[in-house]
A protein has these predicted regions:
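DUTPase catalytic domain/fold
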Residues: 1-148
Length: 148
């Protein structure tokens, strides 16, 4: 598949261009742009700047920001909002809302890879009111209703 073009603007000279770690990576790494190391105590949150703004190609794309698996598993450093959603019309700086869910403080170093950016297509929906919804085998079952 051909790569799509995502224009980016450097807002801070220390910013690193998002990069894919391997040819099979689904997301590109985002790096912290910090004046000094940032220590997050357990349960502390911070908005980590990247020094970059992006322009997504058209209204039917989105950038999703995810935690890096190694940081979350080894240190409890996660996205404070679960998944960051960057809308196609947003032109401000990409910032990563992070929370330390670990038991020990964690220090983010300037230039450290802190999150992953995944570009994906988006469907917009026309929401239509309905008196009845189609039947399915699952029906209204949710929250573990399909078993372990």
């Amino acid at each position: 598949m051909e790569p799509i073009t995502v224009n980016y603007k450097v807002l801070d000279a220390r910013a690193k261009v998002p990069a894919y770690a391997t040819p099979g990576s689904a997301a590109a790494d985002l790096c912290a742009v910090l004046d000094e190391p940032l220590t997050l105590a357990p349960m502390e949150r911070a908005l980590v700047p990247t020094g970059l703004a992006i322009e997504l190609p058209g209204a039917h794309s989105v950038a999703l920001v995810y935690a890096r698996s190694g940081l979350s598993i080894k240190h409890g450093l996660c996205m404070a909002n679960g998944v960051g959603v960057v809308d196609s019309d947003y032109r401000g700086e990409l910032k990563v809302p992070m929370v330390n869910l670990g038991r020990e403080a964690y220090t983010i170093q300037p230039g450290e890879r802190v999150a992953q950016l995944c570009i994906a297509p988006v469907y917009t929906a026309a929401f239509v009111p309905a008196e009845e919804l189609g039947d399915t085998q699952r029906g209204e079952g949710g929250f573990g209703s399909t078993g372990k």
